[in-house]
Amino acid sequence: MSQQRENQRGIVSQTTTTTASPILKLRAQERQARDVSWDANVVDNEHLNKKKTKICCIFHPSDRNCDEEDSSSSSDSSSDSSDNEEDDKNTKIAPKSNNNKKKSKPNAYEVQPHYKNQSKVPGK
């Protein structure tokens, strides 16, 4: 707000007053701790041996096919120099014996766990 006043001598004086704008401070109420409580009718599905719908498939390579493919791809990429050809002739891959073949085991996602303490569904 501005006011002007003139004295008897002809001098003009100006008085300016400004008001500070109010500051609004907001504070949230204190929250209560959240607690989870289960009703007596809630069914425990954790230990009921239910099959999972999302099973992760992990690739189990066949025993000898992967080794043969790896060795053939590495020889294709070699250059035509005589040093590399001599090295290729001297290094031979030993054939795998069938005695060491192990039956591949399913991974942890493919096996259904066996629980000792199974919950019972009410009404059954």
UniProtKB/Swiss-Prot annotation:
Residues 27-37 have a biased composition (Basic and acidic residues). Regulator of type 1 phosphatases which maintains protein phosphatase activity under strict control. Belongs to the YPI1 family. GO terms for cellular component: nucleus. The gene is YPI1. It comes from Candida albicans (strain SC5314 / ATCC MYA-2876) (Yeast). Residues 1-21, 115-124 have a biased composition (Polar residues). The keyword Nucleus applies. Keywords: Nucleus. Residues 72-81 have a biased composition (Low complexity). Coiled coil: none annotated. It comes from the Eukaryota. PANTHER family: E3 UBIQUITIN-PROTEIN LIGASE PPP1R11 (PTHR20835:SF0), E3 UBIQUITIN-PROTEIN LIGASE PPP1R11-RELATED (PTHR20835). Its main location: nucleus. This is Type 1 phosphatases regulator YPI1. GO terms for molecular function: protein phosphatase 1 binding; protein serine/threonine phosphatase inhibitor activity. Residues 1-38, 62-124 are annotated as: Disordered. InterPro entries: PPI_Ypi1. It is found in: Nucleus. GO terms for biological process: filamentous growth.
